[in-house]
Amino acid sequence: MNLYLHYLLFLLEVKTLKVCLVGSSGGHLTHLYMLKPFWNNKDRFWVTFDKEDARSKLKNEKKYFCYYPTNRNFKNLIKNTFLAIKVLRKEKPDLIISSGAAVAVPFFYIGKLMGAKVVYIEVFDRYNKPTLTGKLVYPITDEFIVQWEEMKKIYPKAINLGSIF
């Protein structure tokens, strides 16, 4: 974990960041929360589902609730695209980080158009095939992190940092 954080900061060459952490509730949110040593002293906000685990874990955090379900749901993709435009215009993050799932897609594309750096962390349990979200955001990421060497065959420009969570 510390290696990842130092590496990320080195790559971005930014001392102070406004960070957007975007992810589905459940495991994706837990993974982002585990990056706390990185985001703890940063100006930050979250985008996730309005579910009990998210409300509990992020009770003292600035957060925006997105529309769900998101996986293969075109209606909510459109709604979340408009939400991304609204939230990102207001917040103007320097960096957007996600480990999935589909809610990350509109935030990454809109954020990239607005000049934010985007970093995607492919989930640990994917060691031989990509996630749909990973495939969709890979072309625009500033950094794409995988946790298995085998995944570099799928994502050649990815950085394998091993298990970071």
Model-found features: residue ranges?
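An amphipathic, basic-hydrophobic alpha-helix
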Residues: R72-D94, L113
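N-terminal subdomain of nucleotide-sugar transferases
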Residues: M1-F49, R55-L58
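Histidine-centered beta-alpha loop that forms part of the nucleotide-sugar donor binding/catalytic region
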Residues: S24, A101, E122-D125
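Active-site-proximal region of nucleotide-activated glycan assembly enzymes
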Residues: A116-F165
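Residues at the starts of beta-strands that form the adenosine-phosphate
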Residues: K18, D43-W46, K62, K117, ...
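Conserved nucleotide-sugar phosphate-binding/catalytic loop shared by glycosyltransferases and other
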Residues: G23-S25, N41-N80, E150, L161-I164
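An aromatic- and histidine-rich active-site surface loop
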Residues: P93-M114
